[in-house]
Amino acid sequence: MKEIRVGLIGFGTIGAGVAKILNNNQEVIQKRLGASVSLVKIADLDIKTDRGIDIEEGVLTTSVEEVIDNPDIDIVVELIGGYEPARTFLLNAINNKKHVVTANKALLAKHGDELFELIEEKGLTLGFEASIGGAIPIIRSIRESFVANRIQILEGIVNGTANYILSKMSDENCDFDVAFKEAQEKGFAEADPTFDIEGIDSAHKIAVLTRIAYGTPITVSYTHLRAHETPEPRV
């Protein structure tokens, strides 16, 4: 059976979740792909914290180069977020002939053109479905299912924190501060929710979706941002 060898960059909450899914769902993955998926290396600055998952000895490393430069790795998954050093890591991985996966919409919004051009030049694949919509396959739908359709408008609530807060305020006629605090308590909002509250996260996602739907690369600087306001309650 073919083996797909994966390297992770980042082993925080999301990275540990990815590792756990790959380890716990091997049988399902093999049936669907006709191939096994193995974690070869995981790079993170903190490899001592217990993430609640059993990792084979020698897999964890503090050196990103052990992932990017490893000839035994087919796919590099970036899970650290932000612009740098994530951009540099992905560019180096692509230049080393690795397929790459990222959920980093901020990076894609700012440096997507550079990444997509290099990926095409090298004949590789850049997977980024998880960057927008979580488990909702919006990117694949636009790229594949609607490929022959003329998309006139993209509209919706694309930020999970905003979705929770606005729904709470509208349905229960409560104040923003109350809805926001509850969103944080339930884990919808980040410890630093600036990107969510100020609309920056939504702008990143709009930039990525616009590029896919219309073939027009835009940056966050081209979008109009407005912070949350109290909506009218539903009657």
Language-model features: locations:
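N-terminal glycine-/serine-/threonine-rich beta1-alpha1-beta2 phosphate-ribose binding loop
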Residues: M1-N95
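Short, ordered loop/turn segments at secondary-structure junctions
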Residues: L45-I47, K105-A106, D113, S131-G133
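ADP-ribose/adenylate-binding Rossmann-like module
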Residues: I94-K110
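Rossmann-fold NAD(P)-binding glycine/threonine-rich loop
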Residues: K105-L126
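Rossmann-like NAD(P)H-binding beta-loop-alpha module
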Residues: G127-K186, I200-D201
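Mid-domain beta-loop-alpha active-site segment that forms a flexible
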Residues: I157-V158, Q184, F188-A213
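Conserved small/polar residues in nucleotide/adenosyl-binding loops
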Residues: T223-E232
